[in-house]
Amino acid sequence: LVYAYLTFLEESGIAPRLCVCSSPFTSAVGISSRAAIPFMLGFGCTVPAIDSLRAVDEESAKRASYILPFFQCSAKFPVYAAFAGVFFRREFSLVILPIYACGVCFALVFGLLLRLLGRQNRICDIVELPRYRMPSFSSVMRSSGEKCADTVKKIATVLLLISAAAWVMNYVTVSDSKSLMQCVSGIISPIFAPLGFGNDLSSASLIAGVFAKEGVLTSLSVFSGEGGVKYVLRELFSRASAVSFLTFFALYPPCVASITKMRSEFGTVHMIKCVMFQFAAAYVSSYFVYQILNYLAISLLR
């Protein structure tokens, strides 16, 4: 559906006009305005969003790939809804929308930072505006089908191997009836202590989230027992640490399908740079969010 939507925008003449409208923002971060469509697709799924960067010049596409995952994909919504339902029940509707807005703000801030560090000037590109037209259903389906098949062909093998590795980590016990996933999460959990969620279960859920963002809730539900996910969230997080966790979750590297797609489009070296940058951005942002909330002791977060 995402590929069909992208094809419709391109063939109808709407896409170039959307690019023109977004040019003040994209040029500010040193990226071609043609990257506006991939950014919008990022709210649906990061994989086709990365694929659509082919329409952007190589330099802008690489720079856009650093901040593209900051546009929150739909797979993250269940996690946001679960946390908001537990810690911000009365302010539920006022919490979800700012999360998505903050993702866009983080993308602009870190995009501007990348432009300044790279000493890149603002981009003023020219976009041709074709006439509006209604594309035929068959052409949309044919083009989107070709794009979908190409994506599956490129990432299927790697994704299958990584999924198998995730299964092994979850179900193979190492010692004391602990799975390999639990052992790994126990090793890395101290890293997240300054962020307010330095426990094994939170770390395990973040590892699961790398394989699929919905895996965060799945991982938590496995160990929730009869109490359910809500009980586990209340036990693991305070309001401040919950906001810190969501900040990290919103900014840390996307799922393996997206990472694999990034590798196929830009190469292994660039993919590693993107993952390291996104992890660093998530860690630093989450650290400051947690420390500031604790320092200010806002009544809402006590």
Language model: regions and residue ranges:
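Selected transmembrane alpha-helices and immediately adjacent juxtamembrane segments
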Residues: 1-11, 94-202, 272-302
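Membrane-embedded alpha-helical segments of transport systems
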Residues: 43-49, 66-81, 98-107, 211-217, ...
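Transmembrane helix-loop junctions at the membrane interface of multipass transporters and ion channels
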Residues: 74-97, 257-266, 290-299
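Hydrophobic alpha-helical transmembrane segments
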Residues: 9-12, 17, 37-55, 94, ...
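Extended, low-charge hydrophobic alpha-helical regions
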Residues: 29, 50-63, 164-279
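Alpha-helical transmembrane segments and their helix-entry boundary regions
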Residues: 34-38, 64-65, 92-96, 203, ...
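Juxtamembrane inter-helical linkers in multi-pass membrane proteins
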Residues: 16-46, 120-143, 187
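Hydrophobic transmembrane alpha-helices
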Residues: 2-11, 22-29, 39-46, 70-74, ...
